[in-house]
Amino acid sequence: MSNKLVLVLNCGSSSLKFAIIDALTGDDQISGLAECFGLEDAKIKWKVNGVKHDASLGAFSSHREAVEFIVKDVLGAHPEIASQIQAIGHRVVHGGEKFTQSVIIDESVVQGIEDCAALAPLHNPAHLIGIRAAQASFPQLPQVAVFDTAFHQTMPEKAFIYALPYKLYRENSIRRYGMHGTSHLFISREAAKAMGKNIEDSNIICAHLGNGASVTAIKGGKSVDTSMGMTPLEGLVMGTRCGDIDPSIIHHLVDRLGYTLDEVNNLMNKQSGLLGISELTNDCRGIEEGYSEGHKGATLALEIFCYRLAKYIASYTVPLGRLDAVVFTGGIGENSDLIRAKVLNLLEIFNFEVDDERNKAARFGNQGQITTDNGTIAMVIPTNEEWVIAEDAVRLLK
């Protein structure tokens, strides 16, 4: 264990993921999840050296109580780890155009995150609560914000401007921002290493596939296009999000079918995607099980998911010009050999030849190439966003 440990916090509206990461190796010393904030059964679970623990936080507990528990109970039991923590790293979903890289948190940064809350109303307010809670519990430690959107700030205007009146961008910042940037950044580095290339000479397409999913074209280590938009709703079919649709559907739902705008927002974010199509589940494992059993809805959901993903990957060869590799990551990307094979088979024109043995081996945390040596490379690389956050925190403190 090095003396460069960072406590990484990822605050959701009703949960808090945490991990203590060695910034040199990426290893986690402690990791856990506090959840059900505001409810009677608010709880926390964590793991130290492979040993699992859990506890109640007390009815209606919040982020503050969770951070206090981490300090007093989790770290209190491991002073040898607590004494080595150098900084707190916060994942922040949306930094708008203001934050193009990670920053040390001060009051101006807090205000900037608050100013971007309209672009991520479910996420940024929760991040601010977590930042305040961490500042109260760790007043002696520097705090660093790492933004999901920052990696995509290298996109050219032709990739991020919507074909709406330009003044909406100029006056209201309506544009494509993209998400999962920290994951895409990590994957771009690791993919270049795996291919034995300098990152400046590598062109990859990264597919981060989980309940939320996005694809990014990365040229020379920089994002040049990405599938998520102003919000995480645009792009691929996801667990409960619809991804790309005809915008006039919104007017039709409101004007003809009597939906309110809030109901439409809920429908497209929480009732659509794999769940909406299959009428079964948003969990890809359940979709694959239904597919294997001949469930019509699950089969259709799986086919649409793979088809949409393959189309995006194909289109991102345009900004790259040359494709060195496609990389799958995220919960689905790292574990579903079925989806990977289906997607790559749809991309046969790009000379992908799936190696069934390699594809099945690259699951459950295993990294590796999943195509034959004769064609274009596709590989699986498990993501590690926490490591990027820890690295950035230590780098900024130098």
Curated annotation (Swiss-Prot):
GO MF annotations in UniProt: acetate kinase activity; ATP binding; magnesium ion binding
Cofactor: Mg(2+); Mn(2+)
Species of the source: Shewanella woodyi (strain ATCC 51908 / MS32)
Gene Ontology CC annotation, any one: cytosol
Binding residues annotated for substrate, in chain numbering: 91
Subunit details: Homodimer.
Residues at the active site: 148 (proton donor/acceptor)
Places the protein is found: Cytoplasm
Protein known as: Acetate kinase
Primary location: cytoplasm
Amino acids binding ATP: 17, 208-212, 283-285, 331-335
Pfam families the record matches: Acetate_kinase
Sequence positions that bind Mg(2+): 10, 385
